[in-house]
From Swiss-Prot:
It catalyses: nicotinate beta-D-ribonucleotide + ATP + H(+) = deamido-NAD(+) + diphosphate. This is Probable nicotinate-nucleotide adenylyltransferase. The gene is nadD. It is an enzyme of class 2 (transferase). Belongs to the NadD family. It comes from the Bacteria.
Length: 220
C-alpha cells in the first residue's frame, strides 16, 4: 500500500557503503537539507557485490554505525533493504520500489556526489532515474566540473534547475547542483588512520567512534 504524502514534502535517499559513516557524509547532506528544503533523508547502506572490494566492516556493523550516527536526529532514518537482500540490486530498482511505497505525487530525490555524476552514464538504466526521482548533486573536493560524454552533458543541461523550490513542486525529473561544504574526509583515510593508530577525532560521530573501538574495527 503506497504511503501517501498529504503535504508533498521533499524526501531524499542517500546511499553509500558507509565503511564507516563519517562527517564527510553527514555534514554536506545536512547543509543540502537546509538549502533545498528537504524534510527527510533516508540513509541506504549498500550491499557490496562479491566482485568488488569488500568492506572491512560486515553488513551488520555498517548498518549499526549508520544507526548510531543519526540516532535522535529527526532529519534521518535508515533503510536496510539492500543489506537484507542475498544479492545486490541496481539503484534504479531500489528507487522504483521506494516510489511505489511513497505514491506517485511525493517529491523524491536521490543524493549523489559529484564523482558519481561524472560516471552516471555507466549506471544501469541511468536515463530512467529522472522518471522516478530528482537528482541532488553534492560537490566533492578535487573533482572536475566537466562531464565525460556530450550525451551526459546535454542530459544534465536539459534537466538542471537553479531554483531549489522547483524540487518540491513536482515529484521527479530535475537535477540540482548543490553548493554544499567541501569536507576532505574519506572512509579510506579514516581506515588508514585506524590502521596506523592515529586519531580520528572530529572526523566522525563519537557514538560511531566508540562502536569502532568496541568492535575492534579497522585495526592494522
Amino acid at each position: 500500500m503506497p504511503i501517501k504524502s498529504s503535504d508533498h514534502s521533499l524526501y531524499a535517499l542517500f546511499g553509500g557503503t558507509f565503511d564507516p559513516i563519517h562527517y564527510g557524509h553527514l555534514k554536506p547532506v545536512e547543509a543540502l537539507a537546509q538549502q533545498v528544503g528537504l524534510q527527510h533523508i533516508i540513509l541506504l547502506p549498500n550491499h557490496v557485490p562479491p566482485h568488488r572490494p569488500q568492506p572491512e566492516a560486515n553488513a551488520q556493523q555498517r548498518l549499526k554505525m549508520v544507526e548510531l550516527a543519526v540516532a535522535g536526529n529527526p532529519l534521518f532514518s535508515v533503510d536496510s533493504r539492500e543489506l537484507l537482500r542475498d544479492s545486490p540490486s541496481f539503484t534504479i530498482e531500489t528507487l522504483e520500489a521506494l516510489r511505489k511505497e511513497r505514491g506517485a505525487e511525493q517529491p523524491l530525490a536521490f543524493i549523489i556526489g559529484q564523482d558519481s555524476l561524472l560516471s552516471l552514464h555507466k549506471w544501469h538504466r541511468w536515463q530512467a532515474l529522472l522518471d522516478v526521482c530528482h537528482l541532488l548533486v553534492c560537490a566533492r573536493p578535487g573533482y572536475s566540473q566537466s562531464l565525460e560524454t556530450p550525451e551526459l552533458q546535454q542530459w544534465l543541461e536539459s534537466h538542471k534547475v537553479m531554483d531549489p523550490q522547483a524540487l518540491s513542486q513536482r515529484p521527479h525529473g530535475a537535477i540540482y547542483l548543490a553548493d554544499t561544504p567541501l569536507l576532505d574526509i574519506s572512509a579510506t583515510d579514516i581506515r588508514r588512520r585506524r590502521h596506523n593508530g592515529e586519531s580520528c577525532d572530529d572526523l566522525l560521530p563519537q557514538a560511531v567512534q566508540r562502536y569502532i573501538e568496541l568492535q575492534g574495527l579497522y585495526r592494522g
